[in-house]
Swiss-Prot record:
Pathway: Lipid metabolism; phospholipid metabolism. It comes from Polaromonas sp. (strain JS666 / ATCC BAA-500). Catalyzes the reversible formation of acyl-phosphate (acyl-PO(4)) from acyl-[acyl-carrier-protein] (acyl-ACP). This enzyme utilizes acyl-ACP as fatty acyl donor, but not acyl-CoA. InterPro entries: FA_synthesis, Phospholipid_synth_PlsX-like. Belongs to the PlsX family. This is Phosphate acyltransferase.
Amino acid sequence: MIRIAVDAMGGDVGPDVTVPASLAFLSGHPEAALVLVGQPDVLAAHPQYALLQSHPRCQFVAASEVVTMDDPIEIALRRKKNSSMRVAMNQVKEGVAQAAVSAGNTGALMAIARYVLKTMEGIDRPAIATQLPNAAGGATTVLDLGANVDCTADHLLQFAVMGSALVAAISGKPAPSVGLLNIGEEAIKGSEIIKKAGDLLRSASISGDLNFYGNVEGNDIFKGTTDIVVCDGFVGNVALKASEGLASMIGGFIKAEFSRNILTKFAAIVAYPVLTAFKNRVDHRRYNGAALLGLQGLVFKSHGSADAFAFERALNRAYDAARNNLLERVRERIAHAAPLLLVAAQMAPASDGVSAVSSMAVDPAVSTPAH
């Protein structure tokens, strides 16, 4: 049975989302169990608490502190050692749970997860990976989305290896295609780091470590040109936020046009099935749940403003990852690519100008395509 640790206090509203989402998840997954971590008095006050308390596949672990969405990383990591977020990570470290899910502060989550679980051998920095809907009817996995704003070429190679393992585990594709986000498809375009990363990815493709498609542009994310798009966290976060803004604007335009007069309102009724199908395809809640790749344990980040439906989707992603042995698949991919990763690391500059801490987890709202 797969057991998932839930930071029940994380997110904008905590138990008001995590409790009903947990109930729905347990109902739909008879072979899964949950460990809800949080403040006992707060959880007990929720109207659905009794249903979880009496559930045979749910247990509670007490935590006296909560990491707020505004807490600096230092406070969350060094002062709140009994926070629900940290205790949830401990459940994974101790083998009680196979994965953890939190909707809390992204920076704090990344720091705590990295401190408690440590990074895998061969990986310098964890990356945030999530899915964005594409025109091909599926989803494109994009990483990094904000954990690392400054990356070297070997970091991008590491992201590609981890992203390939993620997509292979969840989608069943043995060799998912990888694209390197750039300002053009030609190999001569882009910064020196991107050019070098392209060379490394091509070498990895030749050696069988990756299925490298080549350079892709921003619009390829939504075309579904490749299964995976790799970029640094700065570029990934900008692309994510731009797509969110565009989706919101289009939705607003459609609503405004159908509300213009009595005729357009009638047209909206006629078009309701089509509009509903469109909404479902682009509904960001369906893609909630970003993987923190590169850790020695499975951790998934839900958006802080997620509702119960969206948080349940994050639980689903964590369950699928654990069920499909994502952690072991990432390890295997890294081990297979170890010679190339070692060479790439030796070629990297001694210092990339920023510390690992200052370049990680800079945006507390980057982890999923939602707002």
